[in-house]
């Protein structure tokens, strides 16, 4: 049976894509046919092959199954803003059924999937629709990426509470050091380990000079249910 996980973050720009790539590398290293899925992406570069979003390209390059770009990222919008604003600017709508249809395609080709969301847990996709509504519909186990900075404890606890209020399982969290580590960072990490009722499955250091291809060592999939 295919293992499926949804990646959310305490905020935008906390390293969800980096964490998703690390998870894919770790899964591949222990024999899985692993794929990344970015159903909705905003902001792209127009190439000879069409619109391409950098986050989706990263997931595609870190998967070890053969997928087309449109399978990894079926919905891409020009404006680099919240999905509900970006799609409205193009006169389009996001249907949750489209996200589910894309997920089924990925499931047919892989046995381990990481689905990367957009922004945080309550990111809107349209009028009265949140990204988390779709996660709830699919009953996806959730992995929380925490950008290690001042305020992250509050953001993490609020997000964890919101996930559980949906009746969903927070199966693990990843600490991503989005700035050079300080003494305070270690205090934040210790407090999060004490307060979050989920295992720490990854601790990714400040990676200013470390190749992105070498991320698997920062992930412990043994802790992931």
UniProtKB/Swiss-Prot annotation:
Cofactor(s) the protein requires to work: Mg(2+)
Binding site for ATP: 13-18, 55, 116-119, 176-177, 205-207
Primary residence: cytoplasm
UniProt xrefs under SUPFAM superfamilies: P-loop containing nucleoside triphosphate hydrolases
Pathway: Cofactor biosynthesis; biotin biosynthesis; biotin from 7,8-diaminononanoate: step 1/2
Keyword tags: ATP-binding, Biotin biosynthesis, Cytoplasm, Ligase, Magnesium, Metal-binding, Nucleotide-binding
Molecular function GO labels: ATP binding; dethiobiotin synthase activity; magnesium ion binding
Catalytic residues in the record: 38
Binding residues for substrate: 42
Any one GO cellular component localisation term in the record: cytosol
Localization per Swiss-Prot or TrEMBL: Cytoplasm
Source taxon at top rank: Bacteria
A Pfam family hit: AAA_26
Gene3D superfamilies with a match to the protein in the record: P-loop containing nucleotide triphosphate hydrolases (3.40.50.300)
EC number from the UniProt entry: 6.3.3.3
Protein name: ATP-dependent dethiobiotin synthetase BioD
Biological source species: Baumannia cicadellinicola subsp. Homalodisca coagulata
Name of the encoding gene: bioD
């Amino acid at each position: 049976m295919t293992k499926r996980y949804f990646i959310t973050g305490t905020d935008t720009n906390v390293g969800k894509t980096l964490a998703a790539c690390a998870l894919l590398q770790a899964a591949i290293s222990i024999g899985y046919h692993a794929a990344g899925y970015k159903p909705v992406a905003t902001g792209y570069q127009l190439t000879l092959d069409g619109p391409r979003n950098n986050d989706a390209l990263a997931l595609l390059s870190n998967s070890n199954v053969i997928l087309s770009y449109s399978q990894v990222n079926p919905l891409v919008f020009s404006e680099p803003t919240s999905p509900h604003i970006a799609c409205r600017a193009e006169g389009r709508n996001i249907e949750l059924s489209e996200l589910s249809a894309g997920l089924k395609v990925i499931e047919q080709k892989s046995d381990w999937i990481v689905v990367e969301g957009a922004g945080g847990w309550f990111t809107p996709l349209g009028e009265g629709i949140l990204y988390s509504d779709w996660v709830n519909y699919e009953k996806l186990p959730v992995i929380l990426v925490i950008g290690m900075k001042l305020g992250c404890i509050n953001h993490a606890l609020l997000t964890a509470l919101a996930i559980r209020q949906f009746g969903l399982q927070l199966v693990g969290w990843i600490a991503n050091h989005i700035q050079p580590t300080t003494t305070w960072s270690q205090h934040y990490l210790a407090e999060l380990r004490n307060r979050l009722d989920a295992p720490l499955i990854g601790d990714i250091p400040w990676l200013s000079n470390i190749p992105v291809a070498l991320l698997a060592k920062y992930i412990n999939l043994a802790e992931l249910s």
